[in-house]
Amino acid sequence: MSSAVVASSTTFLVALASSASRGGPRRGRVVGVAAPPALLYDGRAGRLALRAPPPPRPRPRRRDAGVVRRADDGENEAAVERAGEDDEEEEEFSSGAWQPPRSRRGGVGKVLKRRGTVPPVGRYGSGGDAARVRGAAAPAPAPTQDAASSKNGALLSGRDDDTPASRNGSVVTGADKPAAATPPVTITKLPAPDSPVILPSVDKPQPEFVIPDATAPAPPPPGSNPRSSAPLPKPDNSEFAEDKSAKVVESAPKPKATRSSPIPAVEEETWDFKKYFDLNEPDAAEDGDDDDDWADSDASDSEIDQDDDSGPLAGENVMNVIVVAAECSPWCKTGGLGDVAGALPKALARRGHRVMVVVPRYGDYAEAQDVGIRKYYKAAGQDLEVKYFHAFIDGVDFVFIDAPLFRHRQDDIYGGNRQEIMKRMILFCKAAVEVPWHVPCGGVPYGDGNLVFLANDWHTALLPVYLKAYYRDNGMMQYTRSVLVIHNIAYQGRGPVDEFPYMELPEHYLDHFKLYDPVGGEHANIFGAGLKMADRVVTVSPGYLWELKTTEGGWGLHDIIRENDWKMNGIVNGIDYREWNPEVDVHLQSDGYANYTVASLDSGKPRCKAALQRELGLEVRDDVPLIGFIGRLDGQKGVDIIGDAMPWIAGQDVQLVLLGSGRRDLEVMLQRFEAQHNSKVRGWVGFSVKMAHRITAGADVLVMPSRFEPCGLNQLYAMAYGTVPVVHAVGGLRDTVSAFDPFEDTGLGWTFDRAEPHKLIEALGHCLETYRKYKESWRGLQVRGMSQDLSWDHAAELYEEVLVKAKYQW
C-alpha cells in the first residue's frame, strides 16, 4: 500500500478517534467526512505530521460586499477552546489568515461566497503562497466533495435537512448573538500557480475580492441573489488587456440553494459581469463622477436595446387588413380613389400590419403572377371563372382578380350599362371576400382571424353585406370585420327593386336595400345597405362627414348616416411623398424643369414656371401670375364656374392652364377658350400624369371651385409644391386650406363660401394683388404650405384607430 494511502487512512482514523474522544459528533461541526490532510508541525512530538485542520474559531457577524456571514458562539467557542491545545497550531490558525483550497490539480479551489458560509482552509495548510486576509476571522474546516455537494449546495452544520438552517444553506454554529463590527477587509496579491487575479485598487474604501480559477464560483454583486444559478457572462478579453492591473478568470456557479420560510426570499437576477467587476472604476474615480458616468452608460445601453427591440408602430394592434377597391394607382386610376388605394396600404404596412389590396385585373400587369387558383362564382345567374394574380410591392400584397368581365376595360372601368356594371361589382365582391382563404400570399393565406376588410365606395359596398349574410350569420368568419369608406356619396349604385334577386341574398335582406325618395320613388340602394352592414364607416374628411348629415349633402342617405353616426369617423387623406415631392419628382428632371425644396424655392420654382410656359407655347414671363386647374370636367369640380368668370380672367394680366377630361360640352369649352385667348389660355383635353405634375410645379396659383369635395388631393399636391390654392370652402377643402390673414401672417391660401362666379373672382382678385404687391407675404404662404406634414403616415395612424374599434365591436 502506498504512503499516500497510508497517510490518508491515518488522517481519517485520527479524525474518528478525535471525534469519539470528545463525545461524538456535535452540532456546529461537519461530521462523517474527514477534512483534507495538512502537513503541520506537531509541537509535542517535535516533528511534521499529516493532521486534520483544527475546528473553526468563533466569527463575529459581519457584512462583506453584500454577503452576510453569521457566526454563533456557544458550541463553536467550545470547539475553538478544544482546538487550542497546540500553541503553535493555534498561532498558525489564529492569525486571521485563511487560504482558498487548492484543487487536486494544484490550482486554487472553489470559494463559497454564500450567506452564512465561512471561507475554508487550504488543502496544504495556511502557509505557503496563500493570500492572507488581515483582520479576518479564523478559518473553517474545508469540506470534501461529498459535503459540498449536499442538496442545498451549502455547508451544513450537522442539522437535519428539514431544519430551517439547513434549508437556508447557512452554517449554524450555535445560538444567535448580536454581530460585532469588523474592520474593512483588504486582500493582497495571490500568486497562485494558475491565473492569479489582482483587482485594481480604488480610492474609496471597499472590500476587494480575489477571483479563483475557472472551477470556483464568483462572488455575487451587492444586492443580488447569492444563490442565483445564472452563469457569468464571458468577459471581454480586449477590456482586460487594456487594464494591466487586473486579470479575471471566469468561474462556474455553485448549485442554487433554497431559502427557509422565516427568512424572506431574495429575487433572482442575472449577474452583470461588467457592472460588478468595475475595471474602469479607478479612472472614473479620478474624474470624480464615476457614478454619473456609469448611470449615463446604462441609460444609453437601455436606449440602444429599446431601439433594437422596438416592435411595430401599431404595437399590440397589429392585424390583417385587406383593402378592396375598384381602382388602384398606378395600374388603374380615374380619381382620388386610385391614389388612396395605392398609398394608404403602404402606410399601414409601415406601421406593422399585414396588408393586401384586392383590385380587378383590367389589363396585363407585368408585376402580377398567376398563383394557379381557379374559383367559380355566380353573378346575375351565371357561373363565372375567376383567377387570382399576385404581386408583392413595398411590403403590400397586391391581388388582382381576373375574369372576362374585367379585361380590356383599362380606360373605361366604370363603363357599360347598369346590368353589366352590377354583374362586375357582384362578382368582384364575392371573389374578394374569400381571398384570405384561397390566395397563399407568401405561402400563408391571411385567414379569417384578426382580419378587417376596408371597402371603398359603392363599388365594394356589397362586401359587408355578403360578409354578414353568407358567413357571419352562419357561424363563419366571426372575428372578421368590415369598414366602409365614403369617397363620394353622390354615386350610390341605385337601381330598381326587381334587381335584388341578381345579388343572390336572403329575401329578408331586401329591407336593407329599399329606400324611398321624393324624386326617384322606391328603389334599391347598394351604398345604403353597405352603410348599415359595415362595422365602421369612414369619410375622407371631418368636414365632409358634417355635410353628409345635412339634407343637401347627404344625397338621400342623410337619415341612414344620422342613425349610424356613432360608428362614423372623418379622416383627411394624405399624399404619397415618393410620387408627389418636388425634391425627387421624376417628371421635373428633364425639359428644363428642376427639382427643388423649401431652401431652393426661389430658384427651382421659377425654372419650372419658365419650362412650363415654353412647353405650352406661352410667353415666358416671370412677373405674370400663372393660374392652373387640374380635375375632372363635370359639374362637381366647378369648371363651368371658371367658364362664367372667363371674361374677367381674360381681362387680367395672367396666364391660365386647364387640364382634364369628362363631359363633352366642357371639353369643347376648354378648346374654345384657348382659341379665343390664345396668348393667355391653354386647354389640355385628356389626362396626363406628367403634365399634372408639371402644372402643379410651374403654376403660381391653383383654383378649385368644386361644388362639393369630399376631401380633394390637388390642393394638397399644390401646397407641397409651393403653389397657393384658391378653393371653395367645402368638404375637405375647408379642412385643409386655411384662409390667409395678412395681419397675422397666417393661412395657406384663399377661400370663398359659395360656388358662384363673383365669389371666385373676389377671392382670386385678392390673391393676385398679394402676388404682385406683397412678395414677402406670398413667400410666407409658399413656405407654410411646403412645411406641412401631409404624408399618409399620420392618416394611417387614424385609420388604425378605426380598425381597432371595428375589431373589438360585437
Curated annotation (Swiss-Prot):
ADP-alpha-D-glucose binds at residue 333. GO terms for molecular function: alpha-1,4-glucan glucosyltransferase (ADP-glucose donor) activity; alpha-1,4-glucan glucosyltransferase (UDP-glucose donor) activity. InterPro entries: GS/SS (IPR011835), Starch_synth_cat_dom (IPR013534). The keyword DNA repair does not apply. Residues 129-148 have a biased composition (Low complexity). Pathway: Glycan biosynthesis; starch biosynthesis. It catalyses: [(1->4)-alpha-D-glucosyl](n) + ADP-alpha-D-glucose = [(1->4)-alpha-D-glucosyl](n+1) + ADP + H(+). Residues 1-16 form a transit peptide. The keyword Oxidoreductase does not apply. CDD domains: GT5_Glycogen_synthase_DULL1-like. One of its GO terms (biological process) is starch biosynthetic process. Signal peptide: none annotated. Residues 63-83 have a biased composition (Basic and acidic residues). One of its GO terms (cellular component) is chloroplast. Plays an important role during endosperm starch synthesis. Determines the type of amylopectin structure of starch grain. Synthesizes long B1 amylopectin chains by elongating short A and B1 chains, independently of the other soluble starch synthases. Barely active in japonica subspecies. This is Soluble starch synthase 2-3, chloroplastic/amyloplastic. It comes from Oryza sativa subsp. indica (Rice).
